[in-house]
Amino acid sequence: MVSSMMVSSAATFTRASPAQSSMVAPFTGLKSASAFPVTRKPNADLSHLPSNGGRVQCMKVWPIEGVKKFETLSYLPTMKDEALVKQIEYLLRSKWIPCLEFCPKGFVWRENHRSPGYYDGRYWTMWKLPMFGCTDAVQVAKEVEECKKEYPHAFIRIIGFDNNRQVQCISFIAYKPTGY
């Protein structure tokens, strides 16, 4: 049985194909940091940076205590009528459908239960129907004024709804009652 087994001690040699000869060896290990050129300047000289010629004036952030935050643009002061009309024009230019909502509290609240529900202030009451086909920002502003007269102690917000994507794209407070 041993005589029938033949063991070859000759080494086999295969010739490398052209595709194998141009292959790059895989990366193994980390290279030393001393091999990389130094890119940092040794001193902390800031004179090469551009300057506007004056001190930097930073805008103060909204206070975190005693002032409620609302929705988009809530960190800004209350909008004047001209700014409100410009926001509505942007909404209409974007081909969104304006919709007005109002709520007496304006915040999320829970009275009878700790878990979230329908009556916890997340859902506001719609003022009339969405303004399908509206192309005039002044018409939307008139609706805000009409809602103010009807509900002077309620928050009023304007929503821009995209009926193609079926999503609400913008929402901002148009009116806050006195004291907020």
UniProtKB/Swiss-Prot annotation:
Location within or outside the cell: Plastid, Chloroplast
A single BP term in Gene Ontology: reductive pentose-phosphate cycle
Main localization (coarse): plastid
Gene3D superfamilies named among the record's database cross-references: Ribulose bisphosphate carboxylase, small subunit (3.30.190.10)
Transmembrane parts of this sequence: none
Molecular functions (GO terms): ribulose-bisphosphate carboxylase activity
Residues of the transit peptide: 1-57
Alphabetized InterPro entries for the sequence: RuBisCO_ssu, RuBisCO_ssu_dom, RuBisCO_ssu_N, RuBisCO_ssu_sf
Subunit structure: Heterohexadecamer of 8 large and 8 small subunits.
Further details from the record: The basic functional RuBisCO is composed of a large chain homodimer in a 'head-to-tail' conformation. In form I RuBisCO this homodimer is arranged in a barrel-like tetramer with the small subunits forming a tetrameric 'cap' on each end of the 'barrel'.
Function noted in UniProt: RuBisCO catalyzes two reactions: the carboxylation of D-ribulose 1,5-bisphosphate, the primary event in carbon dioxide fixation, as well as the oxidative fragmentation of the pentose substrate. Both reactions occur simultaneously and in competition at the same active site. Although the small subunit is not catalytic it is essential for maximal activity.
Protein name (Swiss-Prot/TrEMBL): Ribulose bisphosphate carboxylase small subunit, chloroplastic
Species this chain originates from: Musa acuminata
Protein encoded by which gene: RBCS
